[in-house]
Amino acid sequence: MKFIPFLLLGSILVAPSVHSHGGHDHRPAEETMIPGSNKNGIEINLYRDKSCGCCKKWGARMVDVGYNVVDNVSNDINDLKISEGISSSLASCHTAFVEGYFVEGHVPAKSIAKLLREMPNIAGLSVPGMPIGSPGMETSQMAAESYDVLAVDFDGKVSVFDSY
């Protein structure tokens, strides 16, 4: 019976890496740090498809302002969105999590800082779609679009959190 605690400890030590958000577990296919991440900064877990370059650019913008961004390449990004209650009308190409909130799409660092400063009673923020000019979607070939950052409450109701 003395070896049971060691078995429990051993099973904990060899368990696969799992991230839990909103009570859901997500096992990434690959997990790496975005280069330049501040290991002492607030951690953002970014989930994206392997082929999405603008998602990685968004992560780099978050690193630029001091966040520690964990890049999770996922094979089930749509399943993740469904399990987190992110409707298709709010969806974008990537989903991130910070301090218990979801951050869907190309949400600017300024809005994330406001979210973490105010800590509202919401599920998360969303920038639906992929607006040109939003973080990770910058281009010199097209004018930036105006867009809203939406606050999403736990019932799925939305309100404007910020406008750009």
Task: Tell where the protein language model's regions lie, with residue ranges.
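Sec-dependent signal peptide recognition
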Residues: K2-L9
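A short beta-strand-turn-helix
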Residues: D25-G41
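Conserved helix-turn-beta segment immediately C-terminal to the redox Cys motif
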Residues: G59-D79
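Thiol/selenol-based redox catalytic cores and closely related redox-interacting motifs
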Residues: S83, S89-Y164
